[in-house]
Structure formats: C-alpha cells, structure tokens
C-alpha cells in the first residue's frame, strides 16, 4: 500500500457520490418536467396547433435543470485530485452535500415545472391571458433549482478548507 495519500481513503467515495447525486437527481427532475409538460403541449397541440411553439417554454425550462447538475458535477469532479497529498472526509462530505443540494433542488424544481407547465399549457389553449401567469410561476419554480446551484457552488468551494497548511 502506498504512503503517498495522507487523507481518508473513503473520502473520495463521498466526493464522487456527490457528483453523481447532482447529475442524477437534476436529470431526473429535468426528465420529469420535460415529460409532464411535453404531454400537455402534445394534447394542447391537437386543439390549437398555432400555440405549440409558444407553449414549448416549460419544456425548455425543465431541460435546463440537467445543466445545473452537470455544472456542479464537473466542479466536484475537478476538486477531487488523485495526485493531491490529501483529501479528507470534510472535503468528501462538502462535495456530497454540494451534490445533494443541487440535485434535490433540481428534482423538486423539475416536478414543479412539469406540473405547472402541463396545467398552464392546457389552460393557455383555452384562455390566452393565462400565459404570463404561467411564465411567472415557471420562473419561480426555476429559481428553486438556481438556489440549489448557488448553495452547491458555495458548499463545493468549502472543500479543501479543512487543511491546516
């Protein structure tokens, strides 16, 4: 066994688990939001095909959630350096909490965007005045994922601060 690594041997596991959690949970939210609001767009397109391009906004907003998870996963994975002299449990836990914060926020935002997008698109087909209200609610739902992204960046930047050197 090599004596080069001075940190905890289980710490990188938690770091990589955080990267995986960020990507998996965010993409689950993006997939749910895209599917749920896409069903609404498809059913609305039968009645009012001229509104399909206008009603694709919830699908796009849900798809962006996966990018947030990708950003955090890349930040975390670049913070885990196998050639570094140490990677402590504090660092692994910081990366795990970063990934969970971003991933679970993306999952919840995706669920909100999917439900609001589905109902909003169908309602917009019957009453076009509801479009602005739907967009505002979608923006607030997207903000949930942005909060998770910001907290994830802050938490991942905490990794490496446990060293006394």
UniProtKB/Swiss-Prot annotation:
What's one Pfam family the UniProt record gives for this protein? ATP-synt_C
- Could you name the Gene Ontology cellular component terms for this entry? proton-transporting V-type ATPase, V0 domain; vacuolar membrane
Q: Identify the InterPro entries for this entry.
A: ATPase_proteolipid_c-like_dom, ATPase_proteolipid_csu, ATPase_proteolipid_su_C_euk, F/V-ATP_Csub_sf
The protein's superkingdom reads Eukaryota
Hey, which stretches end up on the Cytoplasmic side? Answer: 34-55, 118-129
Bilayer disposition of the protein: Multi-pass membrane protein
The record's subcellular location field reads: Vacuole membrane
Where is it chiefly localized? Answer: membrane
Q: Which residue numbers mark the site Essential for proton translocation?
A: 142
The residue ranges for the Lumenal side of the membrane come to 1-12, 77-95, 156-165
Sorted UniProt keywords = Hydrogen ion transport, Ion transport, Membrane, Transmembrane, Transmembrane helix, Transport, Vacuole
Q: State the Gene3D superfamilies in the record.
A: lithium bound rotor ring of v- atpase
Role noted for this protein: Proton-conducting pore forming subunit of the membrane integral V0 complex of vacuolar ATPase. V-ATPase is responsible for acidifying a variety of intracellular compartments in eukaryotic cells.
Protein family (similarity comment): Belongs to the V-ATPase proteolipid subunit family.
Name it.
Answer: V-type proton ATPase 16 kDa proteolipid subunit
Q: Which gene encodes it?
A: VMAC1
